Amino acid sequence: MVGSGAAGGGGGGGGGGDHARSKEAAGMMALHEALRNVCLNSDWTYSVFWTIRPRPRCRGGNGCKVGDDNGSLMLMWEDGFCRPRVAECLEDIDGEDPVRKAFSKMSIQLYNYGEGLMGKVASDKCHKWVFKEPSECEPNIANYWQSSFDALPPEWTDQFASGIQTIAVIQAGHGLLQLGSCKIIPEDLHFVLRMRHMFESLGYQSGFFLSQLFSSSRGTSPSPSSFPLKQQQPPPPQLFNWPGHAPPQLPPGASPLFPPGPAAFHPSSRPMPPFPGGGKDESHLFHLPPAAAAKQPQHMDEHHHHQQQPMAAPQQHGGEAPEGDLKWPNGLSFFTALTGRTEDAKFLFGGGGGGGADDGSKTAAAAQDAGHGGAENVEEYLSLESHSNKARRMESAQSTKFKRSFTLPARMSSSTTSTSPSVSASTAPAPPQQQQGMEYRGPHEGGVYSDLMETFLE
């Protein structure tokens, strides 16, 4: 059993090795085909690809680690292609080709990574163009190369002597591409970019020795499957943190920042925050009028019962104005001074300052004579909301009729006592300051001052 398992394991390892070797062979074939196409489809005579590899052994017996420093890497011949020379006659066929001879010597060369012209081009990831003789337009090109870089490689001298006119070095992929031509080929940036793209994509597809070398020598490079999955982030805090109750529960899959619908955070979908304290003696900010309170559900009547008690207090005290309201000597309050409607102020605050229950009955009688109807509750006039609604209806009814307010002359004050009881309720004995604020009303309101009004207007 153990022997069969070991044999099976060996067979699996052999299968993995065969796959790696076949992949490497396919990569080498693709590289050679690319180098060949560069020479056959252009004016370049030869093409060589130098790969970056670590030195096998250092002095002392210790293996050098990849990437420690530039001295541990080198440029080594990987593959090359040289186009055969076209013989002009049959005698030259058997003759030796000097270009091919110089090309063959390149296969045994080694260059230090980051040193010299070849090493610096590879480390700096750039490209260089070198000509045999400077042209007329570039007379100082040789001096430029000599000053900015190290001296040209000594084997390039043999190449120039064999007939090579242009040498180009381009960093591409995991190595360096060297091209040589027997013609003068000007520098072309588009060609450089095309070569880089071709050899980089070729290297990533075929998986050259260098990529396998780095992944195997480092040993700690993580694979895509070893990366942990993205951890789920905790949900962000709620947008509305109401004190006193838990945040609303969102449906599954819904984000707190993007609710499922517009009603998610609607005011009606959450309870209102409690008032600070919450005692019974503490008044709320808003009070509903008695008419609206009568329409409330039964379970809300008990809650608002203690709120309506302060509202009914002015009725029990004869319609007196609230203590916080300012009064002028003529009896007008701050509210009536702003609105300019003294007859409505009488409905609110009454004609006198301390009439007691009699003033309350006078206010009710004046409300019936003014056309408001006896069926309505007098408390409605104590609410600012109902008062404003009644005032608007009175203005719309009297918009087409004549109405003016004048100060009652002193000599006519005695005649007002013989008027109908409905008007005497509104002209009850009052301080002299308030008698000056009395009004004349139109015929539709009482029918008692029509003759006086016409006489006064004439």
Curated annotation (Swiss-Prot):
Keyword Transcription regulation: yes
Description of how the protein assembles with itself and partners: Interacts with BHLH094, BHLH089, TIFY11A/JAZ9 and TIFY11C/JAZ11. Forms a ternary complex with TIFY11A/JAZ9 and BHLH094 in the nucleus.
Biased composition (Gly residues): 1-17
Gene, per the UniProt record: RSS3
Spans traversing the lipid bilayer: none
Record localization: Nucleus; Cytoplasm
Region (Disordered): 1-21, 220-325, 354-374, 386-458
Tissue: Expressed in root tips. Expressed at high levels in the meristematic zone and at low levels in the elongation zone of the root tip.
Source organism phylogeny: Eukaryota, Viridiplantae, Streptophyta, Embryophyta, Tracheophyta
Comp. bias regions, Low complexity: 220-232, 308-317, 413-436
Protein name as it appears in the record: Protein RICE SALT SENSITIVE 3
Coiled-coil stretches noted in the UniProt entry, renumbered to this chain: none
Alphabetical UniProt keywords: Cytoplasm, Nucleus, Stress response, Transcription, Transcription regulation
Positions with biased composition (Pro residues): 245-262
Keyword Cytoplasm attached: yes
One GO location term (cellular component): nucleus
Cross-referenced Pfam families: bHLH-MYC_N
Role this protein plays: Involved in the repression of jasmonate (JA)-induced genes. Forms a ternary complex with TIFY11A/JAZ9 and BHLH094 to negatively regulate JA-responsive genes. Involved in transcriptional regulation in the root tip. Plays a regulatory role in root cell elongation. Regulates root cell elongation during salt stress.
Highest taxon above the source species: Eukaryota
Disruption phenotype: Defects in root growth.
